[in-house]
């Protein structure tokens, strides 16, 4: 899915940083009073690269529609959580074709661990997230060989708006999934 799923599927974006600190993009998310959210994604130069719009149904399943900078739909993601608190997200392209998924669980310390697979079920990478006492979340991404390829850091302000910064160990590598 576009470069390690474009390098890894993590579709709640934030500003990321990697070992070498190349800023490769950011996103800002706004959530309305109905709980629906809209994210605007930008590249390292601040140019808009696309948007994501999410809503959650009465069953607690979240559907996200991804659009490019011209507003064209390029894919969707559907997230569900089981009775054990494990989360599965399935990704589809603009034609509805299955292109991969992610599976997450949260440990007893509140850290989230995620594995990613492509459309054929092959393992493509993983990520690990933790949230500090200030509510800031840091995520580290690794490829299918366990090599760290980047990271992201997210902060939610008092209005509930979330900003994420992304950094990669390669200036040409994106961690975004879309």
Where are these regions (language model features)?
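Repetitive, compositionally biased segments used for assembly/scaffolding
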Residues: 20-178
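Sec-dependent signal peptide recognition
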Residues: 2-8
